[in-house]
Amino acid sequence: MKLFKYVLAFVLTVILLGIARHISIRVPEFAEVISDGIKLSHTSVTEKIGAGDVKILATLVIPSPEENYSLSLFYKIGKGEGQYTSVKMQPVEGTNDQFSAVIPSLPKGKRAYYYLSLSDSQGKKILTLPEKLDLLNNPFLVKFKGKVPPYVIGPHVLLMFASVFFVFLVLFTSLEMLWGKDSLRQLSVYSLWATILSFLGGVPLGILVTNLTFGEIWGGFPIFTDITDSKTSILLFYWIIFLILIKGSAFGKDKAKNLLPDKALAWFGILGYILTLGIYLIPHSI
């Protein structure tokens, strides 16, 4: 039975972290707009890892090659009311319908918003990509990130994986306790390991990953509002509180020192699982 719990916890951990990774990755978006026989298309650039300019490519198909059109890239640094910089896109050598321009390299942690604009020979704007630019339909976004070496990101992911594995064991053990089985000692051990591994993966290594990626030390609650760091804070806060409630069993074998009865602790374990599940299903800021 114990082996089955471990195998099931492992499988569910793989599934959960796979889903979490999938919803956190910003996939390049193919966008296209057609107007009066003119077709403009572009696959967005979502991130730039490491130093270097960001090359923006677009495809422009026009019905009458003799007509004169001007395709421009507009970009600005950071969100807000700042002015866009305009760069005329140049034909890509060896092609008839490919155009390119670059967004200059920026420090890690910076963001650039951009869109494409096509004008006729009189300078009149014909179309833009994205087609509608307003508060509800933002321009394309590219994030500038630093490189995170494998020897940093590897242990970080492994520790967070292990912490979720123990959270699933907390869930299974909590359910056993509600069904009448005396699994308090197991619950305390699993919750202790979940807390320790979450701390190691989320604080020293999590802070290092954030610093290498965005150039920040800590961007989350209670100081800032970064989603990923704030999730780590909330998760650690809950599991530390849970350890305090179950301290008699977690740090010894004195059940009398626990601050809540067994079934209440089981419900706290289930709530911890639900919180962990919800937090991991919130996309990372990275």
For each feature predicted by the language model, list its residue ranges.
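Glycan-association/targeting regions that enable binding to alpha-glucans and other polysaccharides
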Residues: M1-V167, L171-R185, L197, G201, ...
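Residue-level detector of functional hotspots within protein domains
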Residues: K143, V189, W193, I207, ...
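N-terminal low-hydrophobic presequence detector
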Residues: G154-H156, M160, S191, K231, ...
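A loop-to-helix transmembrane entry motif
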Residues: Y190-L200, I223-K231
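C-terminal TM-helix exit segments that contain a strictly Trp-centered aromatic cap at the helix terminus
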Residues: L200-L212, T276-I286
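Membrane-helix boundary/interface segments in integral membrane proteins
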Residues: V209-F221
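Generic detector of multi-pass transmembrane helix bundles and their immediately adjacent loops
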Residues: G219-F224, T228-I286
